[in-house]
Amino acid sequence: MCLTITVWVLLMVLAMQGYLRNPLADPGLFGISACAALGAVLSIFFGLAGVPFALPLFALIAAALGAGLLMLLAGRSGSLILFTLAGVMLSSLAGALTALVINLAPTPFASAEIITWLMGALTDRSWHDVLIALPLVIVGMALIMLKAADLDALSLGDLAARSMGVDMARLQRVLIGGIALCVGGSVAVAGVIGFVGLMVPHMVRPLVGHRPSALMIPSALAGALLVVVADMVVRIAPVASEIRLGVMMSVLGAPFFLALLLKMRRELA
């Protein structure tokens, strides 16, 4: 299950980093992951979390709505600036609505359940949760893989990509659709587990190069190994209550992110 979910996460992150040409790009930049989390939180708020498949369905629907709103706001120009600004706005809006739902939770138990779920974990998940999201995620993965060559061309710059026949507006729409399906599936199953997509590609790039298409499979395997090890650590750690996987990944990811920023600053100096 770790392998399956991590593959979803890594593919969408690599697509995002390739499209934005920013090695620090993260799913939160699009706002779709925040929308998926909002959908899952709403299912808990309305007491539907116990209904079979309700939580993943809410997350997938919210991710799809977020993707539609993102495409509407970004327009048809394919502009990276508009796309990024629309994603930041969408992420802020979904985050604010999630905080509002937590604030309006009918009982302290509902509020605690929402916060616990948002921390991300695999301990209480099953293959039933994965299977409901799997068909849509397969479509999302296929959309991303079909555009792998366009992402490689885009790494040479906008003008070079256009001269090679890349339709920027179409590429944007296809990637938003693929990323929305992968984000919705991963958040629906595991909650919010951050920094995996940020750390793993940087570990793999020195070994396989910088082409997005060459990074996809090695990053997925390396990411799965990282998540499995982190999940084992949080399960056996000698603490009073189990540390959530999302918390552990954030503890590992924040120093890694800082090291990347310092490295980039030295290179630019």
Regions found by a protein language model. Give the residues of each.
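Alpha-helical transmembrane segments in inner-membrane proteins
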Residues: 1-269
